[in-house]
Amino acid sequence: MILIDTTPLVALCDARASLHRVALRDLQALASERLGVCEAVLMEACFHLAADVQRQRLRAVLDQLNIAAVPRADDRGFWTEVLDWLSKYADHEPDWADGCLAVLSGRDTGLKV
């Protein structure tokens, strides 16, 4: 499964985005792959896609591409792992979604970002 990060997801949903065409091209290259998204990425995408029509497009993209919801553990262990990862890579200034993607893909080697 390929985990989708915020930038390509937003680009798929907003034709005005500078990376829209690149995202469409990359999506075609990944047509045979299973795609997934975590809650933190959806939260960031909704922040960037503030208009109702953009969020409707987000919902359509999730549905049409059958993008799986990648569950995250709601336990302190998961949060601690993410916080530890954020601390380890603090010089790169990662955000919570970056940490979630890193920890999820680290827990399951079948997941790629």
Show the residue positions of the predicted features.
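Short alpha-helical scaffold segments that flank and stabilize functional sites
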Residues: 9, 26, 48-49, 85, ...
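Conserved glycosyltransferase catalytic-site signature
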Residues: 6, 39, 96-99
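Alpha-helix N-cap/helix-start and coil->helix boundary motif
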Residues: 9, 42-43, 55, 76-79, ...
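Short, well-structured N-terminal submotif of metal-dependent ribonuclease cores
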Residues: 1-37, 49-63
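Active-site neighborhoods of divalent-metal-dependent phosphate/nucleic-acid chemistry enzymes
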Residues: 71-113
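Short, mixed-charge aromatic SLiMs
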Residues: 31-32, 64-74
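Amphipathic alpha-helical segments within well-ordered protein domains
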Residues: 10, 43-46, 66, 83
